[in-house]
């Protein structure tokens, strides 16, 4: 018997086994790819449903408070642009962007007589209005996947100097996303008409934000805001559906003063 022939047969048998094994591996790989693709499609559907839910919650807020119609989308877009300037990783946080849309969800629990009052709120009404951040947190408490969005809902009225609400947080104790959003929120408040006052000019609103650095706002966020000011007129005009160059004249009683008297007085 030729010993070489036996060795060749062994090699051929091993080759056949390897081919069978390779086919099985390829079959498993293709099956896993198909499974992963189906899971990705299911995840996309889930993300779409989740985003629809977020948008529905935001719509409920705007439906209850007509004076802030489109405010949620505008502040979301301003905040996203500002977050990108502050820290691209922050801007990439999907949960945070949900928080930008849902920041005022707690207003659903505020009486319409307070929300839609055509004038400044009295002390008692202010106390009611100041409850909306914590009401919002309670409303979304069951949505575990919101993550950092809850920080924006809770803390978007906190101030760098600790004089905000609901918790009186100061400085870096305020979550990053909320620090970014408070600037975007104030800017939109100042450049939008409200029932009891007209919007102030774009340039003046930018100056008010700059003046609020270190008191109402995080100085680093204000610095980032100042850096994107040249790009803001186009975004501002598109969100307000008008030509660039300002929001129109300030209304009666909107004379010189700190940002507090214009933006932060708007709940």
PLM region descriptions:
Residues 23, 44, 51, 58, ...:
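Metal-dependent catalytic cores of enzymes that make or break cyclic nucleotides
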Residues 2-55, 59, 66:
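Amphipathic alpha-helical coiled-coil "transmission" helices that mediate dimerization
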């Amino acid at each position: 018997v030729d010993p070489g022939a036996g060795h060749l047969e062994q090699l051929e048998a091993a080759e056949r086994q390897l081919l069978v094994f390779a086919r099985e591996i390829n079959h498993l790989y293709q099956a896993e790819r198909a499974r992963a693709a189906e899971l990705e499609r299911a995840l996309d559907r889930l993300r779409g449903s989740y985003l629809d839910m977020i948008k529905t919650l935001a719509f409920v807020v705007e439906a209850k408070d007509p004076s802030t119609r489109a405010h949620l989308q505008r502040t979301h877009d301003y905040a996203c642009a500002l977050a990108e300037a502050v820290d691209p990783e922050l801007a990439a946080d999907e949960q945070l962007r949900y928080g930008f849309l849902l920041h005022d969800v707690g207003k659903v629990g505020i009486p319409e007589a307070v929300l839609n009052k055509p004038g400044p709120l009295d002390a008692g009404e202010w106390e009611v209005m100041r409850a909306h951040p914590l009401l919002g947190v309670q409303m979304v408490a069951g949505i575990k996947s919101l993550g950092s969005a809850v920080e924006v809902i809770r803390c978007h009225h906190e101030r760098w100097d600790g004089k905000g609400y609901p918790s009186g947080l100061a400085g870096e104790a305020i979550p990053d996303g909320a620090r970014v959003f408070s600037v975007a929120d104030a800017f939109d408040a100042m450049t939008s008409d409200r029932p009891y006052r007209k919007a102030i000019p774009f340039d003046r609103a930018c100056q008010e934000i700059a003046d609020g650095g270190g008191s109402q706002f995080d100085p680093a966020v204000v610095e980032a805001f100042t850096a994107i000011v040249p790009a803001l007129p186009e975004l501002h005009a598109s969100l307000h559906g008008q030509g660039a160059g300002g929001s129109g004249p300030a209304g009666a009683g909107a004379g010189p003063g700190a940002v507090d008297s214009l933006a932060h007085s708007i709940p």
